[in-house]
Amino acid sequence: MTGTETEDDIPLGERKTVTDFCYLLDKSKQLFNGLRDLPQYGHKQWQSYFGRTFDVYTKLWKFQQQHRQILDSRYGLKRWQIGEVASKIGQLYYHYYLRTSETSYLNEAFSFYSAIRQRSYYFQVNKEDRPELVVKKLRYYARYIVVCLLLNKMDLVKVLVKELSEEIEDYTQRFNTEDQLEWNLVLQEVAAFVEADPVVVLNDNNSVVVFSNRMLEGSTPPLEQGMVKFSELTIDMFRMLQALEREPVNLATQTFKQGTLEPNEKPAKRENPHKYLLYKPTFSQLFTFLSASFKELPANSVLLVYLSATGIFPTGHSDYEGPYDFGGVLTNTNRDVVNGETMQKRNQLQKEMHCLHPGDLFPFTRKPLFVIVDSSNSTAYKNFTNLFGQPLVCLLSPMVYPKSVQDQSQRGSLFTLFLYSPLLAFSSMCGLSSVRRGLWDRAQEFLCKVYRDIGQMISRSRTIDQAFLQFFGDEFLRLLLVRFVFCSAALRLHKLFRESRSFPESYPELPKQDTVESSLLQKHVLELAAMLDVQGALDSPPTLDFQWRDLRSTYPRTPHPFLLLNVRSSQQAKVCLAQITRTRVSTLTR
């Protein structure tokens, strides 16, 4: 209403339009707020609720588009309110992606967040004397940045970080708030993500090239014939998240209709493992999610557990060494108070309450289980007993790293980096800080050949445990196994990796002569080093007839700067549970 106009002066149809809009707006807020109370596990418990929420927001969005003029004049609809609705829809798609692992929903979230910025929905917020509205804008920027990071839109991330920095500076100058340090921390966390890769790839004009490390079609070695923390998102979790996803279809080329927030066509369905991401969980939280994942696991599927945390070592000696006597990984720190009471100092024979011991995973070996442990006590998980005869494999990180090539926790774990991008990890381990685009492409092409050879080594070995072959039929697990073997071979040839504790291990143990110490694989690693001109970082085994001189003409020298990694600090517990299955998740209709 405007001026002296009363409600009775408004035509009945327009009054009904405002009433219907208010109803949809209230209903959408009610449903959206209810999402936080839903458990993250159990499809049946949350999928229908998400469907209802999507439906109401779709109606609300279309309704405000169709009746914008009436809502502007009669309701006083402001552009930031439209932006808030669009932001909520973006959040819906992002959280649906987290629950389903369907990367196409990231594109949907990006389309809404992008349109908010393009149409300056939050532009007028800075002119309002209401700090809570500015906070809405800052939170929008933070969410938009997370989505862009997951889509590897690094150039846009840098622009958004600059804009967010300016917005935070303006916000803290205008309002005397207590959350200034919190927002500055957000900026620092984003900057750490942007600078996390220890090696950059450069074009001819010295501009940085950004690559996605999600699985591409044809990027996994073929099977042989007849074979069956930004926003609590740490860099290691970010890398494993992408290692367990396929590249979204038409990610770079998808266009959007003019004047609408809807894409031209619905995103194509892709098969990705359903994942749960846990940051510093308590043992009870971790066990709850493990149990839910185990219960939901379809037939012919496997549960993957990725653990990245500080190692907990046994405090005393026991005559009987069982599955709880080798320590494990610490799931949560600073847990000195239990049920309101301060914990007394533990007896040496007592176990750490918030340690995940190998024995804690025994109940879940009733179904196929694939475990990755990145920790200073990873080898505790070699002490498994396959009680139920189901396929079981554990890939275990080095326990220690050489002092001069230490794993820098701020930039993530070297072991996880190998599972995410072997070429990035290899280049970093050998001291490279930058690589030219042409050389990078040739090295990646060479690695594809290496992966095929590793795949043949595994599938043709007569002494390998059958568990590896049973998991080798899945594309994601096959790629992880191949990268693990390459990592093990590369570390064994590096001059500074000399302790046995500095090498990755596995349960069951891989036949070394057929895989990680194969002369063919060793030759491939040395060839890659020659290609990158980092021969000085590796040693040729005395048993291998290999001449560096033969390769120098094949791979000419390329000048490059060097970078050594800094000291690693203690890890904070990160857990990723993934259900590797070919079962599709039904698509929500918009």
What are these regions (language model features)?
Residues 1-69:
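N-terminal alpha-helical scaffolding segments that mark the starts
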Residues 108-225, 385, 441, 449-493, ...:
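Cytosolic small-GTPase signaling regions in large eukaryotic proteins
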Residues 206-353, 372-375:
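A domain-level signal for caspase-like cysteine endopeptidase catalytic cores
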Residues 245, 343, 439-588:
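C-terminal functional modules of predominantly eukaryotic multidomain proteins
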